[in-house]
Structure formats: structure tokens, C-alpha cells
From Swiss-Prot:
Zn(2+) binds at residues 141, 144, 153, 156. Keywords: Aminoacyl-tRNA synthetase, ATP-binding, Cytoplasm, Ligase, Metal-binding, Nucleotide-binding, Protein biosynthesis, Zinc. This is Methionine--tRNA ligase 1. Its EC number is 6.1.1.10. Belongs to the class-I aminoacyl-tRNA synthetase family. MetG type 1 subfamily. It comes from Alkaliphilus oremlandii (strain OhILAs) (Clostridium oremlandii (strain OhILAs)). Disulfide bonds: none annotated.
Length: 540
């Protein structure tokens, strides 16, 4: 089976925070899981290096947009690598090949009469002497009455036009813009209404509820044609006569990246990329809820406009992460920055918390106290404790060698069942449930260790003791295998310590007589005082 997994492309206009990672982590879990199952996987993403957020930051810092994009693209790559993201290709939207492909697609859509010219009212700032693209405008959302940008409201996720906003202001100088007429290019999104409606009906059990509800809302309102050109000097030039000075709307540019990077990957690796874009391939898209309409409506319409009938099979769209009960605010430094966190904490501790408490169905909160409790409780107290006390026992009483033992039927059946249950949970995007299923098993094996009292039977019945430890070691190697999609770093350590090189999504066997490698503590205890230190940094 060919499985394509696309992770949303973060704007390269500032450091990643935990909200970004929480939305994107499910993609890595799925990629690792499907590879272990032996499926043919292509997992891609990249940095969104165009658009107004980058232009605004560059203007504020008196540098070029290219410098800003370069700085944060490098930082993103480093952070994703440190966090264990296993992208097959991580690209960028200012890549030359991507630019050529996007321009080719725009031309093709124009030739196919899915793009047309239209005179529209636009906002113009007399003080700045320029037309204002969407993100250069701020105002009040007409739907929920909160402060919003000119392209979308972060609170209610409504896609907006700058003219929709009340009490509009120029983001650059703060003055009130005036309305002027100008020509723009529009994509005939309305032409795809019926096709997208039919696909929504087919996706009722495959997309997350927020994706279904959000997409259904737009379809009920009736799809509106969307402007794809912007009055900017940073971005991909429109390849149509009379519009060469305008740039491609950043969200058209970004979602087409899934397609263009697949082609580039195929060319560079001499691989058949088109198998991942056939109707038979399975597509997963991983992103936050604010990105839903771009993936559920705009991207499939663009693909159909150039002859690809592939539709999104699974949309794994996360709700938001709050921080200490409040909305994340990058401007007020009410955020946990990923570059800082990966320098201070175990990456598997970060991954575990964000996956075990992920915003799958509703907003979730990141609390420093809960993060420390999570590390010290589940990871250290349950998982790490099982591994450490079993390994220490083997070293002390069995010369660091896996003893002879008979696998107990109950443990074997529970393990086989776990692979099936966890696999189903992952494939449906229920990662919180998948992790809980594994940790229930961990707790049951800890209970088994306690009830079998090997510290007593080592002196009274060595065969019973050997059997207990053998079953614990069998459980540990399979737990590590099951947790590999979630916690790849700690799983790799355990497999190395136990001399295991298998990576399939099947029950692993355990051979007696193998010597354990040098091992150490899997997870360190975190001092609760760290929570106070981290809290003191917020909002400063």
C-alpha cells in the first residue's frame, strides 16, 4: 500500500512553539507505524518561506524577507530533527523547483479556465503608499467579534477577506486604510462545490469531527471563488501577462508544496513518486484546525483543476494547545519555544506529553507542573521503573544474560492483541487512546512483577524467578517496539540494550542466553522546582 503523509508547512517568520509541534507530531507517529507495517510511505513537509508574516517581520527588523526565511528554515530543520521527526523530505517554498512547478500549475489552471481576472475593491494605505494584502490588515472579526487578521480569524477559524473586518487598521503603520479598485486573479473554487460535497459525505468516518464540521459549514454557505494573487514583492511571481508584479497567494503556494516536493523527491531519489498520487494511494494530512479549509477544500480543488482526482482520505486536524490555561501569544512571549525546550528536556518526554494530552477533540492545556508530573509519573515511575528494575535484576542475579523461561499464554495473547488495537487506534488518528492502551499494558506488567516477587523466588525457586524475568523482558522488548512510533529515542535505546534489530509491527520473540548491553536510566526525574523556573519566564 502507498501511503502519503503531509505535515503542514510552518511559517518561517519566528521560532516554533509547542502548539506547532502538538499539531504536527501525529504525522511522525503514523509514518513510523506504517513503515513498521511494511507499507510504502512518503512523509513530507517544509518551511513556508513566503507570505506577509515574513515580510512584516523583515520590515520590523530592517532585513530582507530572504534572511528571515533562511534563519527560521534552518532552525525548523534542526528542531524537527532533534524531536525525532522522520520526514522523507523536508523542503521550503522558496526552493527553485517548487517555484517552477507552482508557476506551471498556475498557467495550467489559467489555460483550463479555472483562473480568471476580476476587478475588486481592495484596501489601500495612503500613508504607506501601497495596497494591503490580507495579513497587512487587522480588525474585528464579523463572526465572533474578536481581533482577527485579514485572511482568517484564529478564534473561530473563519476564512476572511480584509474588507470583511470591522475597524480595519494597517498592520504596518496603524492608520485606517481606504478602499480602492484593482485587478486580481481568482480561482473558481465554486466550480468544485458538488465534487467536494460528495467527497465530504464519503469522509464522515475518516476525518476528525472538526474537519467535517468546518468543511460542511463552508459548503452549506456555498463556496466562493478565492483571489490567488497578492500585491506583494515577496513570493512566487504570477506567470500570467499583466500580473507579473503580483505574487501567488501564500496558501496556494504552500499546499501545492505537498505535490511539488513529492515530484522533487522522486527525481532526486530516482523513485516513482506518482504512485503516491494515484487514486489508490492513501493520503493523510496533519495540521491544526485553522488549516482545515485549505486542505479539505482548496487543495483538492486545485489538484482536480490540473487533472488529479486524488482527494484527502484522512484529515488529522488538531484543536489548539493553551498554555497554563491561557491562549498562546507569541507577541507577549506567552509561549514555550521549541529551541529552548529541546535543549533542556528529554525529547521523548516532550513527545509523550503532547501525544498523551494531544488536542484531538478539544483544546488541550500545557502546564509545566503537569509536564513534570507526566515525566516523573508515567515515563519514569511506570515505564522507566519496569525497564530499570528488570534490567538491574538480570545484571545482579543472571550475569546480565536473558534467562531461560516459558512465555505465559496470557502475556502472549495480551501482546498480540495490543499490536492490533494500537495499530487501529493509530490509523484512525486516536493517538491518545493508542498511548493509553500501551501504558495500561506497562502497568499490568509492573503488577505482574510485583505479584510474582522475583526477589523472593530467586532464593526459593530459581525456575519460577527465571520465568518471571523472561516474561518481563519479553514484554519490555515488545513495549519498546510498540512505543517506537511515539517515543523513538527511548525505544531505540532499549532495542540496542537487548540486541534487537527488528522493526516490524509484529510480536517480537525473545531468545534466552543473549547478554544485555550496557544500560542506564531511561528517564531522569525532574525537580518540581523547574516548574517555577519555567513559569517565571512566561510573559517576559
Amino acid at each position: 500500500m502507498n501511503i502519503f503523509i503531509g505535515g503542514a508547512w510552518p511559517y518561517a517568520n519566528g521560532s516554533l512553539h509547542l502548539g506547532h509541534v502538538a499539531a504536527l507530531l501525529p504525522g511522525d507517529v503514523m509514518a513510523r507505524y506504517f513503515r513498521a507495517k511494511g507499507e510504502n510511505v512518503l512523509y513530507v513537509s517544509g518551511s513556508d518561506c513566503h507570505g506577509t508574516p515574513i515580510s512584516i517581520r523583515a520590515k520590523n527588523e530592517n532585513v530582507s524577507p530572504q534572511e528571515i526565511a533562511e534563519q527560521y528554515h534552518k532552525e525548523f530543520k534542526y528542531c524537527f530533527e532533534e524531536l525525532g521527526f522522520s520526514y522523507d523530505y523536508y523542503s521550503r517554498t522558496d526552493d527553485a523547483y517548487h517555484k517552477e512547478e507552482v508557476q506551471r500549475i498556475i498557467k495550467l489552471l489559467y489555460e483550463n479556465e479555472f483562473i480568471y481576472e476580476k476587478e475588486v475593491e481592495q484596501l489601500y494605505c495612503a500613508d504607506c503608499n501601497q495596497f494591503l494584502p490580507d495579513r497587512f490588515v487587522e480588525g474585528i472579526c464579523p463572526v465572533c467579534k474578536n481581533i482577527a487578521r485579514g485572511d482568517q480569524c484564529d478564534v473561530c477559524s473563519t476564512i476572511l477577506d480584509p474588507l470583511d473586518l470591522h475597524h480595519r487598521k494597517c498592520k504596518i503603520c496603524g492608520s485606517e486604510p481606504e478602499i480602492k479598485n484593482g485587478n486580481q486573479l481568482f480561482f473558481k473554487l465554486s466550480k468544485f462545490q458538488e465534487m467536494l460535497q460528495n467527497h465530504l459525505e464519503d469522509s464522515k468516518k475518516k476525518w476528525r469531527v472538526n474537519a467535517l464540521n468546518n468543511t460542511e459549514r463552508y459548503l452549506k454557505e456555498g463556496l466562493q471563488d478565492r483571489a490567488i494573487s497578492r500585491d506583494l514583492n515577496w513570493g512566487i511571481e504570477i506567470p500570467i501577462k499583466g500580473y507579473e508584479e503580483k505574487r501567488v497567494y501564500v496558501w496556494i503556494d504552500a499546499v501545492l508544496g505537498y505535490y511539488t516536493v513529492s515530484k522533487k523527491w522522486g527525481i532526486e531519489r530516482n523513485r516513482d513518486w506518482e504512485t503516491f498520487w494515484s487514486k489508490e494511494a492513501i493520503h493523510y494530512f496533519i495540521h491544526g484546525k485553522d488549516n482545515i479549509p485549505f486542505h479539505s477544500l482548496i487543495f483538492p480543488a486545485l489538484l482536480n483543476g490540473i487533472g488529479y482526482k486524488k482527494m484527502p482520505d484522512r484529515i488529522i486536524s488538531s484543536e489548539y494547545i493553551t498554555l497554563e490555561g491561557k491562549k498562546i501569544s507569541t507577541s507577549n512571549n506567552w509561549a514555550v519555544w521549541v529551541p529552548d525546550m529541546i535543549e533542556r528536556y528529554n525529547v521523548d518526554s516532550i513527545r509523550y506529553f503532547l501525544l498523551a494530552n494531544g488536542p484531538e477533540k478539544r483544546d488541550a492545556d500545557f502546564s509545566w507542573r503537569e509536564f513534570i508530573n507526566s515525566n516523573n509519573g508515567e515515563l519514569l515511575g511506570a515505564y522507566g521503573n519496569l525497564v530499570n528494575r528488570t534490567f538491574v535484576f538480570v545484571k545482579k542475579y543472571f550475569n546480565n544474560t536473558i534467562p531461560v523461561g516459558k512465555l505465559e499464554e496470557e502475556i502472549e495473547r495480551a501482546t498480540e492483541k495490543l499490536y492490533d488495537e494500537v495499530g487501529k487506534s493509530i490509523e484512525s488518528g486516536n493517538l491518545r487512546l493508542a498511548l493509553e492502551q500501551i501504558f495500561q499494558f506497562i502497568r499490568s506488567i509492573n503488577k505482574y512483577f510485583d505479584e510474582e516477587t522475583p526477589w523472593t523466588t530467586v532464593n526459593t525457586n530459581i525456575d519460577d524467578c527465571s520465568n518471571t524475568i523472561y516474561n518481563c523482558l519479553f514484554s519490555i522488548i515488545n513495549i519498546a517496539n510498540l512505543l517506537n512510533p511515539f517515543l523513538p529515542s527511548s525505544s531505540a535505546k532499549i532495542k540496542e540494550w537487548m540486541g534487537c534489530k527488528e522493526a516490524s509491527w509484529n510480536k517480537l520473540s525473545l531468545s534466552s542466553g543473549i547478554q544485555l548491553g550496557d544500560f542506564n536510566i531511561l528517564f531522569e526525574r525532574l525537580d518540581k522546582k523547574l516548574a517555577e523556573e519555567e513559569l517565571a519566564k512566561l510573559g517576559r
